[in-house]
């Protein structure tokens, strides 16, 4: 039995300077590639500016649209492969909240990258607007994951 207290493994990433939001800071960190945080920050802020312009609002409307989009894309269940006996089963499992937001961010970035707009900021903006309205590739991906979990619900008793 260890003599010292357990170490908290979750790092505090703080909040972003413009919106004061933990969610936006996390999104910037996931957009970031090769440690280029200023570039990631400018991409995300350009996307928020485009969203605000499209919604005829300010930063608060853009942030509200982003939070709504993330809520629309977050999965509740996912499937995990588990070997039981001679076969491999796709077992539906619940998704923790932290993983759900991370998956939502990844899917939004992935589907924005596959769009054909000129800049990444515009692609992200269009994906945020589409996801907030309930359509778009990221929402489709979430629905596919949920459909897969529903199809394999018979194997849910294998989760342990």
Please give the residue ranges for each predicted region.
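Strongly charged
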Residues: 2-34, 38, 46-160
